[in-house]
Amino acid sequence: ITENKEFIAGKNGTIISMGAWGDIFQTDRFIDMSINLIIELIKLGNPIQFMSKYKLDISLISKLAKYVQYTNQVLYSTTITTIDKWKTIEPNTVSPEERIKTCKEFKNQGIESNVLIKPFIPGTTDLELDKIIYLLKEYNITYCVIGKLYISDDILKSLGKDCLINTDALELSTLDCNGNIKIQATQVKTLYKYIEKFRENGINAFFKSSCVNSNINKTNNPSNYYFNNDEYCINCGNCK
């Protein structure tokens, strides 16, 4: 990381993110390695965000917390797509409530937590919005991110027949990680009303985890969504 020319060290530098494309706590043999890696990354002094859909032992959370250098250096996130159909859509994970309990344990250790409503499946997730909001408020989770659904034939098949998708809310969109690939995805403009509903219920909702990280640290988002007038910017007032 430090050898990357684009890496900026320090509190106001590059946000280090782990777990977006693979769960770092999925199996026991990866847990210790992941914890030790996060500790080494914390030592760099940069803001760090990592995520998991699995339950983490309190002793490991406490171990991590001891290395945090400043308030809000670390942001822990979990993901919820559905409360009622998680066994079908997210098999081999722990229940949404168990995931949020882990978020609460991080908060108890002084590490801010965030819930990714991601992917937000139009026709499924929106029908459970009140349940999700209730669960977040029950465990005092005050930050969440609503994420687009990227859909292919393989993904559609894996979701199963029980998952209903409102195809009217989809459009051709480029992947964030590769602008050369276009795939069916949720229209961001259709998600703004859900952002507003979370905020009306006292939950700070965004489209990007980096926005949560920037907000808790009161720094400009290095992704520059605000300055580029990007559709992901909700004009929360943080970036100046």
Model-derived features: positions:
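Conserved AdoMet/S-adenosylmethionine-binding subsite of the radical SAM
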Residues: 2-187
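C-terminal accessory extensions appended to soluble enzyme cores
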Residues: 154-240
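Poly-acidic low-complexity segments
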Residues: 1-2, 235
